[in-house]
């Protein structure tokens, strides 16, 4: 059982995804550039966790909390130490997933939790976020730590999907649609393969994305 989403699939990025398999703990990262980590998104609104969702001990942005993945705690949002980042997209997404699951499969919802993390980097190209670079390693570290913590807690663990909020930098750099498509396809396939290798899951990792259709180039003015 699970929830049906219209998403980008690892092997077929423009198709209709099958229902993802949900385990006890489900790793859900918010990935991309600045919006994915809550740039200027203040005040924060998720100050109390009402759906049982989780984050690592270091916070929803673990890189701000010393990358402390030694335990899980209730998912809440906070302002970054430098004051630049606030509410990330992952809390709203996880909360809505849980509310939808409670409507469609209330019996299963009582056992399901999302383990959330915001691992993006502001102002970078999709290339910087691709496999082999430091931001991507955050996802691998989350996966490994999540699997170990879930095992200790006697919980099943998988990665059903990730949130993707990126594209403004590549649009500014005049990258073509075909170039971006291939980069995106490779990223989804890499995350899918690595998640399966860590968790042992059979189901594909799905991707929620958005379209940067009307973005003005940085520092441009709207006449």
Model-based region annotation:
Residues 16-223:
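Cell-envelope and extracellular/periplasmic
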